[in-house]
Amino acid sequence: MSSVDQIVKTFAKLPEGERNAAVNAILAMMPPGPGPVRQIPEPVSQAPAPKKKVNGFMGFRSYYSPLFSQFPQKARSPFMTILWQHDPFHNEWDFMCSVYSSIRNYLEQSNAQREKKITLQYWLHFAVPVMGVLGRENYLPTLGWDLVTMPNGTIDLMRIAMPLFRKNLQPMNGLCLFTKCQEGGLQVDNQHLVIAKLSDPSYDMIWFNKRPHYQQRHAVQADSSELGVSALFPRNHAVAAEADDVATLQLPHWMQQGDFGTESGYSPQFETLLGSILENGNATSNDSYNMALAMDVPMMGFNGGA
């Protein structure tokens, strides 16, 4: 076998990248001819495909799933779905995950050489307290959830209480969330790139904690089977039965009618008491009632807050 045949066979067995390098090396040894020497282009590495955007439920599940670590995944998934359906922090989760999605590549590249990578769960460890979202250890008891053993021996997730819960947050954008996470201990090597990204107006995801008008807020509560309007009134008050009727009316009804209790069929006592509660959180009597639903003050916990 000639040397040329041997070279050709060896060349044919080389990977594509090494073939290009071998051809360029051979061409470099050739004497210059009348025309330009043709170079074989190096293979161009493809840019990594953009990663899927993380939505609020993905973040919620990542953060709270360890609450049920004793169960197999088959049992955990229904629990997480139930909790998400009743979670009061959907806007906050969507916001935290939107910010993470926009800077995800920078965060993953930043600490590539460190033992502690900035994963979604690690990011949420810092973002959750900044946003005022309930921590993992307090979530179930604060919102009235418990794991209950059923008569057949299975364990089910049940809501055994309906605590009143208030949240009071300040307006925040993505850059503000990131800097507050850094103040809380988040370490990012290439923070200048993240700051530049979040400072770009096209990526400035604003999350407003806008207070709704009192009529709008209580209209939503009236449309919720979990927050009946009767919760606004003093216990055992004479107009409580009328309040139960209010809770059965749909939201469009209130948007058309305007103020609560102004339509015919409700007693003057009902109108006076409800109007007073919605305006300033004060009933006309000295009886106690759930002020957390009627006042714009930060409250958290059971029965109007602690």
UniProtKB/Swiss-Prot annotation:
Record flagged with keyword Ribonucleoprotein: no
UniProt keyword Signal present: no
Single annotated GO MF: DNA binding, bending
Keywords: DNA-binding, Nucleus, Transcription, Transcription regulation
Alphabetical list of InterPro entries matching this protein: MATalpha_HMGbox
This protein's GO CC annotations: nucleus
Entry's localization field: Nucleus
Domain of life, per lineage: Eukaryota
Record feature DNA-binding region, as residue ranges: 49-104
GO terms (BP aspect): positive regulation of mating-type specific transcription, DNA-templated
Cystines in this chain: none
Similarity section: Belongs to the MATALPHA1 family.
Protein purpose: Mating type proteins are sequence specific DNA-binding proteins that act as master switches in fungal differentiation by controlling gene expression in a cell type-specific fashion. Transcriptional activator that induces the transcription of alpha-specific genes.
Protein name in the entry: Mating type protein SmtA-1
